[in-house]
Amino acid sequence: MENEASVVQFQKVVGTRYVLTGERNTERFRKGYRSGFGEAICVIKPGTLLELWQVLKICVASDLVVIMQAANTGLTEGSTPNGHYDRGAVIISTLRIDTIHLLDNGKQVVCMPGSTLYDLENQLRPYERQPHSVLGSSCIGASVIGGVCNNSGGSLVERGPSYTELSVFAQITENGELQLVNNIGLELGSDPETILKSLDTTDLSSVNQQQTDKKASDNEYSKIVRDVDADTPARYNADQRCLHEASGCAGKLVVFAARLDTYPKNESEKVFYIGTNHLEDLTEIRRTILSEFNTLPVSGEYMHRDIIDITEKYGKDTVLMINMFGTQRLPTFFALKNAIDTRLNKIKIFSNITDKLLQQLAKLWPNILPNQLREYQNKYEHHLILKMHDEGIDEANKFLDHFFSDRTGDYFPCSENEGKIAELNRFAAAGAAIRYQKLYSKDVEDILALDFALRRNDRDWFEVLPADIDEKLIHKLYYGHFFCHVMHHDYVVKKGVDIETIKSEMLEILDERGAEYPAEHNVGHLYAAKPNLADFYKSIDPTNSLNPGIGKLSKSKHYADT
């Protein structure tokens, strides 16, 4: 009855149509993008920041667990409920609150909690500027604030994790009181209602900006990533340097708005495709470019031959779709696909039907990889997709020409189409592994996906697993952001193998190597938070009412059972 009363209150604030109840109506919000599932009384979809504040006040008064959710594209279950809680739980979906304000001709932006990277990219285009992340998460509708809350990384070498010290957020205090904090550096008023009404209705480009030395991006990262002799990783989720209020909060605060730097578009860019059978070649390329070039790469993506093979076959439809229609249709496509899967997967004969259909359709299409990429795929085990910009293009051309003059590896400057397809093939890699799992579910127990950061001075970066682990795997799929030494490993595990056991063995190996994990997907409910990260979560959410249980911490009120 108490929960029913709360639902009625929510309906009065946001309207009946924006409060979803019942298992079927709420399932797609309670189920994670890759994995994860939990209970929720309802899903609430406020349309303004003031409505969000009013909903939060009801939640606090009713002692409810709150799961904040935007695009629900998290890969480690941190965007959804996790099983059962000791209190009732609600999901607050912020996608209706998607306003973006441009400051100083687009040099900075203020983003509301439902704004997406795709929309931000579009709004910045006339100003010849870019958001923190491009091509990748933006293609599946990821939110700007979700990236900030999880210190999301990405492929762009110069930018580091998504970070800001300028935000407006709500916090539940030790005494269980809800308070609003305005640290965004804009004069918006003094009380919560006035501040939020200002954010909801005011043109922020005309609002007085307070003098502040607070950062709106990780502007130190380019120096950090260049230090190739440091014995620590360049970036990872538990890095104390990037845990500040909204940044890294992982839903333990309710973020109403964040102020972020944007980046000028490069005048020119060029992709170089590198292939080799010798790991030390890529090691020397990375160390030389980072430490000696005047211009840092735009990106440098590593792919092992095995993941290229898998992606060419099982990620082909994704590459085709983006190549033909662009990225703008992908969020709608994925939303439609997920809605169909949610309904049909309950019927055994229709399980994974959309993946099976898409796979068959892709087979009818001719090979999409350009000939020279295919030649390198057959010839070389290790591949690097290096994108340089402006003066760095000439630097890379001269260096690579000299570097491979006496080595068996090789490189070539890509045409526009070759570079585009190479990058799209890398983007499709993670989805290709999941497609493989769904098509061969009788043989596959699960995909164990690990993202981790190696030390910057690691020369022995390629993994060789012990035989007793290797024999439990169908495929080992290796790719990553090579210059940042952030690696993504997808292990296709044989049927019948205990996933938690093999994961524990893998993490022990990473510990021995001095790696940090996760690097950029955050702990969610799949990784244990390191002590400093756990302390950060507890300090900003002392009652454990917001996203309880992440980092494998207690789900109980006040962390009672830890």
Go through each PLM region and give its residues.
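FAD-binding subdomain of flavoenzyme oxidoreductases
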Residues: 125-280
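Glycine-rich N-terminal segment of FAD-binding domains in flavoprotein oxidoreductases
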Residues: 23-26, 30-97, 111, 131-134
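Glycine-/small-residue-rich beta-strand-loop submotif within the FAD-binding core of flavoenzymes
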Residues: 81-116, 155-159, 177-178, 260-264
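A conserved active-site cap/scaffold subdomain adjacent to cofactor or substrate pockets
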Residues: 265-299, 306-309, 313-360, 369-403
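Short, structural beta-strand-to-alpha-helix junction motif
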Residues: 48, 73, 107-108, 115-120, ...
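Conserved glycine-rich FAD pyrophosphate-binding loop
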Residues: 33-35, 39-41, 64, 69-71, ...
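Short, conserved secondary-structure transition motifs
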Residues: 142-149, 301-317, 423-425, 522-535
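General beta-strand structural signal in soluble alpha/beta enzymes
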Residues: 19-23, 45-46, 66-70, 77, ...
